[in-house]
C-alpha cells in the first residue's frame, strides 16, 4: 500500500508544481489569457517540437507594447527618391561602411566567392538596414512580436509564426528569449533578419557553432549572401545601368512586375537606352525599367533580375536602388 500511495503523492505534487508554475507564468505573461494564445502554442508545438512548458517559460514576463501598434497603423509617408536617397547616401554612412569593409574584407571576399553575391551588395544591405550595425533596434523582440501576433489582426498569423520561430531559435542557441532586441517589427541584428529567416537562411560564418546576427558581423555577411543566393542571385551578372528615355509615354516602358522582365530589344525600340554609350546590352537580355523621381524630374534605370532579388529583402524599388548605389560607393573606396 505504501508505494502506490507514494506514487499518487508524487504525481499530485508534480501536478501541483506544474500548476503553480503555469499560474506564475500566466500572471507574468500579458498574453496568456488572449483567446488566440492556446492556438499559438499548439501550432508552435507542432511546428518546432516545443513543449507547452517551454513556450510558457519563454513568454513569462511578456508585455504588450501599444506604441508598436501605433507605429504599424500610422499612415506611411511616401518620399520621392531624392529625399529617400539622402537618408542613406550620405558621407557619414559611407565612411562607416568603408571602415566596416576594411575590417571584414576577408569575410566579404569569402562570401562573394562562395555565394556569388558581390560584396558591394552585402555592404549596401548592411548600410541601409542598420548603418553597419549602428542601429539594430531597441525593442525586446519577443514583446514586439507578441504585441503584433495578438494585437494586429491584419498580419496576426505572420507575426505569430515569427514569435514561434523566435522561441525555437533562442532555445536552440541557448539565448534567453527576452534577451533579444531588434526592430519594432521583430527584425534582428546587423541584417535585420526575421526569426524564421534566421532559422532557414542564417549561417554560422565565423565557425563558433552559433548563428548570432546581433554580434557577429561575419555571420551577418554570410547570412545575407546565402539569403540572396537562395532567392536566385545570378553570379557575375549586372544589377542594372542608369538609362535615358527618349519617348513620351513612360508608362509603356515602366515595369509593373519585376518578376516578368522584357527582352531589352523591345524596350530599346520604345526609346530606352543606357546613359553610358559604352554599355552594351544584348537585345535578348531580360530586363526591367524602373522610374524614380529626382529633384529635376524622372530618372530611369535598366535593371536585371538581380535587382529584383534585392527587392525580396524589401519590396521597395527605392530600397533596392539605395542598396545598390550605397554598396557600390562603399566598395569603390
Regions found by a protein language model. Give the residues of each.
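An acidic, Gly/Ser/Thr/Pro-rich helix-cap/linker signature
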Residues: 29-103, 109-112
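Bacterial N-terminal signal peptides that target proteins for export
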Residues: 2-13
